[in-house]
């Protein structure tokens, strides 16, 4: 059974988070948390939080009635980093011109499955 968690509207560019998602895809959940814990990137904290949330969802008795989940047997089946909405800002330039600034956001989706 799949256990899912989503962090929507994360204020970080998808381009900065996708390499971190590639590091943990297919790994066991506890191993993925260990990998992310020692990454010096801000996106690692975000993915780590989503994995912890998915682990909590897996242990929730309301979502899994009558089943006990062994957390050690869960692995990261899917990590999707989708682009969210962009905030549009303007950077003033010389001679009255302006350049656009796109402040990008991300939707981070993690799916855990049992081995």
Residue ranges and their predicted role:
Residues 1-12, 18-23, 28-115:
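Structured, basic alpha/beta domains of bacterial-type, RNA-associated proteins
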């Amino acid at each position: 059974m799949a256990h899912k968690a989503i962090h929507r509207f994360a204020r970080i560019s998808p381009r900065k988070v996708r390499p971190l998602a590639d590091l943990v895809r297919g790994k066991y959940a506890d191993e993925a948390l260990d990998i992310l814990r020692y990454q010096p990137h801000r996106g690692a904290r975000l993915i780590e939080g989503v994995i912890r949330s998915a682990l909590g969802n897996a242990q929730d008795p309301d979502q899994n009635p009558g089943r006990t989940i062994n957390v050690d047997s869960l692995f990261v089946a899917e990590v999707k980093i989708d682009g969210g909405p962009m905030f549009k800002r303007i950077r003033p330039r010389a001679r009255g011109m302006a350049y656009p600034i796109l402040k990008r956001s991300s939707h981070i989706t993690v799916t855990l499955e049992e081995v």
